[in-house]
Amino acid sequence: MKKNRERFCNKEREFVYKFQVGRERLELRVPLRFPVEENASHLHGRLMLLHSLPCFIESDLKDALSRFIEEESLRDHDSDAEACLEAVKSGEVDLHQLASAWAKAYAETTLEHARPEEPDWDEDFADVYHDLIHSPASETLLNLEHNYFVSISELIGERDVELKKLRERQGIEMEKVMQELGKSLTDQDVNSLAAQHFESQQDLENKWSNELKQSTAIQKQEYQEWVIKLHQDLKNPNNSSLSEEIKVQPSQFRESADAAGRIYEEQRKLEESFTIHLGAQLKTMHNLRLLRADMLDFCKHKRTHGSGVKLHRLQTALSLYSTSLCGLVLLVDNRINSYSGIKRDFATVCQECTDFHFPRIEEQLEVVQQVALYARTQRKSKCKEARDSGNQNGGSDDKSKNAERNYLNILPGEFYITRHSNLSEIHVAFHLCVDDNVKSGNITARDPAIMGLRNILKVCCTHDITTISIPLLLVHDMSEEMTIPWCLRRAELVFKCVKGFMMEMASWDGGISRTVQFLVPQSISEEMFYQLSNMLPQIFRVSSTLTLTSKH
C-alpha cells in the first residue's frame, strides 16, 4: 500500500489552458506535481504574474485550474483506493492489523467514542489527592481503591478460570488426535489442530485483555472525577453531612481484620534491622534491613483489608507525592517487555489493581522501548563514526562489534524505571539488566550489575527515593551452584560495594538518612540467613545500643 501511495504522490500532470487574445489563439501549459500542496488561489496568482497573462482571463483561469486539481486529485484517490483493496485481496496486507488500525482511528476521531474533555490531571489531580490523603478522607480513598482492586481481581479470576477450561478442553482434543495419529490422521492434521488451539487462546486472551483495559480506564476516570468532586465538596463549610460520612466510613472494613490476617498469612519472613553510621568527617546515619522475602511481596495487594495491610497501604499513599519515595530493584533480562520470568509476574501484579496516577505498565514499557531505540540508534552511529575514523585499535573494534550485536537490546548494567501508585509498598521499580554472569562466583566490583546498583543509588539521591530494596545475592531464586561459600562471597561483595556507594551518596545529597533493604530468596535456610546477618556488622559500623535502667 505504501508503494502504491508513493507512486501516486510522485506523479506529474500537465495543466493545459487555451484562450484567445484578439484573433490569436494561445495555450498555457504548466506541469503540476500531485498531490498539489499549494493553495489553488496562490498558484493562480503566481501563474498570472509569472506569464504576464491578460486580466480578462483571470476568473476563467482560476476556475479551470481549481477544477483540474480537484478532478486529478479525485482520480488519484480512486486509483489509490483500488490498489489498496487489491493488496488486501491478494494477502499482501494483514487484514487483522488493518482492521485494528481502522478501529483505533475511528475511536480516536469519532465524537461518539471520544472521551469528554478533561482538565489537566497531572498537576491538579496530584495536588488534590495529596490534600485529601492527608485529611480525614484518607481512609475513604483507600476503601474506594480497595473496592476497585477487588473488582479487578474478580475479573482476573474469571479470566483465569475461562483460560484454564479452554486449555483443558484443548488438551483432551489433542490427546484424542494423538491416539489416531498414524491411523486415520497425519502430522498435518495435528499441526492444524495445534494452530487452531493457539489461535483460540490468543483470541480469548485478547478479549479479556481488552475488557481489563476498558475496566481499568473506566475506574481511573471515575476515581479521578470523584476525588476532584470530593475535594470541592469539602471546601464547602456548610457540607457537614459529608464530613460526618467520611468520619464514619473507615470502620466498615475492620470487623474481621485479625481473622483475615491469619487466613492470608504468608510464609514467615526473617528480618534483622540495623542502624549504621558512615563517614569520618561528614557522618551520616542510615537504616539497614536484611530480609528473607519474595521481592514481589512488596508489590502485592491482599484481598483482605486488615489493619496491618491498611497501614502499609496508607504509608505508601501518604508518601506518593513527597520527598520520601520507596523503590525496589528487579533483575531482568535484556528485552524490554513483560513476557517471561519475574517481568511477567511483576506485570501481573501491576494489572491486579488500577493505577490512578500513572500510565499502565504496558504504556510505560512502550515509552521505554522508544527511548531505548533512540539511544541504540545514537550508539550505533557513534560506533560507525569510530570505525570510519580509521581507529585500528583491536579492543575498540571488539567493543564496536559487541555494541552492534546487542543493538536491539539493553546491555547488562543498564536499567529502566517504571512508576506506580497501585503497589503495596513501593512507588518506583528499577528494572536492572543482568546476564548469566551473575550466577558465577567470580564477579568483581567492576561487574556491570554492581555498577548498575551504583547508578540506581545515584538516581535515588537525585529523585527523593529514600527507601530502596536490593536483592543481596543479585539473584531472585537459588540454584544448585549457589553453595554457602558462594552466598557468603557474594553477600560480602555487595555489602562492601553498597557501603562505598552510600558513602558517595553523602557527597551527592548532603547526607540524607536512607533505608536500604537487602533481600535474600525465601528458599534460603535460616542458618544461612543468620550467617549473613552476622556478617553485616563486620562491614558496616553499627550503632551501639543503650540500655536504660531506673534506680529505685
Swiss-Prot record:
Function: Component of the FERRY complex (Five-subunit Endosomal Rab5 and RNA/ribosome intermediary). The FERRY complex directly interacts with mRNAs and RAB5A, and functions as a RAB5A effector involved in the localization and the distribution of specific mRNAs most likely by mediating their endosomal transport. The complex recruits mRNAs and ribosomes to early endosomes through direct mRNA-interaction. Plays a role in mast cell degranulation.
Record-level GO cellular component terms: cytoplasm; early endosome; protein-containing complex
Disulphide bond pairs: none
Subunit architecture: Component of the FERRY complex composed of five subunits, TBCK, PPP1R21, FERRY3, CRYZL1 and GATD1 with a ratio of 1:2:1:2:4, respectively.
Pfam families: Fy-3
Name this polypeptide is given: FERRY endosomal RAB5 effector complex subunit 3
GO BP, one annotated term: regulation of mast cell degranulation
Protein localization: Cytoplasm; Early endosome
The keyword Phosphoprotein belongs to this UniProt entry's keyword annotation: yes
Keyword annotations: Cytoplasm, Endosome, Phosphoprotein
Species name: Mus musculus
InterPro entries in alphabetical order: Fy-3
Entry-annotated residues carrying Phosphoserine: S79
Gene: Ferry3
